[in-house]
């Protein structure tokens, strides 16, 4: 049961299945009880509950690890996620809460992610610490089905000289579906062909032919600390239209600027349009850097949507789950 009273705590899932804590405005997290040393996620906002993921204990020095943990759906009935914020401890790249159809047999599993984990996964909440800035507009939500199994996918890049332990939490607000909200989902276009020579500039680019009409309420780019510029443009009706054009800063890796659109006037992408994603970099290290240590991604959220869409190096696919 999810308690919505601002004065109650409702621990529903324990141990390997994670924990949900609720809820209320200005609730102060208890580091000693719930969080690892040095990790102090922001307090809960109005009507939010907190999902605390199980620890990731196997992040080796220099490791680039994606970890998948399956938990039971803690909510009674079908609910709409109407706001979400995701947070990670040190070395976190992103944390995403997803719904996975047909994953009942995996309940309680926690391990390195495989391609099978990404099949049939749908975005629900999170992203990165940038989720603190993420806004879900009125009339749109990410829907959790009544009987679903949830998966927490976390990505860690340990740049230290020793092994690390990681933790992720989600502060989310949910409401019962009321017939007026449309379900939304994630769209991402990216390239895995990213190579930065030592101490030099570099570029990466990809294009994606849109396969279906989409209405987006948010659009943005994603690169890491060596990015210097990210552009998204669209070819349609014989013209090229600039959609997103940002100089890049290292902190944008966790806090990328997003462009928002009103749901009554969303950004329209049409079948046959060609989306271009162009990224520029300056490698300040002595080592060659490749994907996924550096990335070039265009991403957004579309509605109505029942499955996430990924377009990797021009290959369109659905239901693969989350960001690259």
Task: Give, region by region, the residue ranges found by the protein language model.
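Intrinsically disordered, low-complexity segments enriched in Ser/Pro/Gly/Ala and basic residues
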Residues: 4-5, 29, 147
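Bacterial N-terminal signal peptides that target proteins for export
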Residues: 1-13
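Bacterial signal peptide processing site
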Residues: 24-26
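C-terminal motif of bacterial Sec signal peptides marking the signal peptidase cleavage site
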Residues: 19-22
């Amino acid at each position: 049961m999810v308690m919505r009273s601002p004065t109650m705590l409702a621990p529903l899932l324990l141990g390997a299945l994670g924990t949900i804590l609720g809820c209320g405005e200005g609730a102060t997290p208890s580091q000693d009880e719930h969080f690892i040393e040095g990790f102090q996620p922001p307090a809960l906002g109005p009507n939010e509950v907190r999902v605390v993921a199980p620890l990731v204990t196997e992040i080796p020095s220099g490791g680039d690890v994606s970890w998948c943990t399956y938990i039971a759906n803690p909510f009674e009935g079908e609910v709409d996620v109407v706001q979400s914020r995701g947070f990670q401890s040190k070395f976190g790249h992103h944390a995403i809460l997803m719904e996975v159809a047909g994953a009942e047999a995996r309940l309680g599993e926690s391990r390195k992610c495989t391609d099978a984990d990404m099949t049939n996964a749908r975005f629900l909440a999170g992203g990165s610490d940038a989720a603190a800035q993420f806004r879900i507009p009125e009339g749109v939500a990410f829907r959790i089905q009544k009987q679903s199994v949830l998966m927490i996918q976390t990505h860690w890049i340990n740049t230290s000289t020793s092994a690390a332990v990681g933790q992720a939490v989600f502060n989310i607000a949910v409401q019962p579906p009321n017939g007026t909200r449309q379900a939304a989902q994630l769209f991402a276009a990216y390239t895995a062909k990213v190579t930065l020579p030592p101490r030099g500039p570099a570029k990466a680019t990809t294009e994606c032919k849109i396969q279906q009409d989409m209405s987006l309420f948010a659009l943005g780019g994603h690169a890491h600390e060596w990015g210097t510029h990210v552009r998204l443009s669209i070819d349609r009706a014989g013209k090229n239209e600039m959609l997103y054009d940002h100089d890049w800063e290292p902190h944008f890796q966790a806090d990328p600027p997003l462009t928002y659109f009103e749901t009554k006037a969303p950004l329209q992408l049409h079948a046959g349009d060609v989306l271009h994603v162009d990224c520029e970099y300056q490698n300040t290290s002595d080592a060659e850097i490749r994907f996924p240590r550096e990335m070039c991604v265009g991403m957004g959220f579309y509605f109505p949507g029942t499955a996430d869409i990924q377009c990797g190096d021009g290959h369109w696919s659905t239901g693969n789950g989350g960001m690259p």
